[in-house]
Amino acid sequence: MNYLIGIDVGTSATKTVLFDEEGTVIASASKEYGMIQPQNGWAEQNPGDWKNAVLETLSEVRERSGVPAGAIKGIGLSGQMHGLVMLDEDNEVIRPSIIWCDQRTGGQVEEMLQIMPRERWIELTANPPLTGWTAAKILWVKKHEPENYQKCRHILLPKDYIRQVLTGVFATEVSDASGMQLLDVQGRCWSEEVLRALDIDRSLLGEVYESCEITGTLLPEIAERTGLNADTIVVGG
């Protein structure tokens, strides 16, 4: 029988579950972590906490299940939306992630509405500018932490940071990307109009995949650490 793993990078914990091909839970593990609140209305987390939680729980479910590594065929990712993860040229995290419930970006939302009418935002991204979404967070960092923005080479969502940790691939999938306010939702691709309007370089963003598409396989060092095979696939969502 073949098996699959699902990883949910949540706000309070990461949970990893091993299923058989009929959907029966074989083993599960979770690891909690905290939130940073530097000011009222701000909410951040350390991406390194997610990374450690994922690697630990992957190892745990593999060990607890006793399932041969070769029988585990794929990994699916889900997680908290809208969070901003910024990596430098060495793929190191630049600053804590500004997560979905952070409300500091009211000024950036107003700026976005001045740049483009509300109706056009809805036409392109299926939503008006919102404080919790990623685009406003990017603008906040550009304005208040220009030195961090200048160092940034990759912008990722939380589960896509985990994808990069596991596979080395910079990618996202349509359901999560739709919450960044940068996606042409109907076209299912990054909106060149939005990126130009906000002066965000397309090269900072990963490729967009459908949720069921294969985005990569495990890096050898990750496979060794978790007890999985390096040919284990990781899908978009």
Where are these regions (language model features)?
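Carbohydrate-associated surface elements
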Residues: 102
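N-terminal glycine/serine-rich phosphate-binding loop of ATP-dependent small-molecule kinases
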Residues: 1-95, 123, 151, 206-207, ...
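Conserved donor sugar-nucleotide recognition element shared by glycan-biosynthetic enzymes
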Residues: 47-50, 54, 105, 134, ...
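Residues that scaffold the ATP/ADP-binding catalytic core of kinase and kinase-like folds
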Residues: 96, 108, 165
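Gly/Ser/Thr-rich active-site cleft segment
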Residues: 9-11, 121-237
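Hinge/lid segment of periplasmic solute-binding proteins
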Residues: 106-117
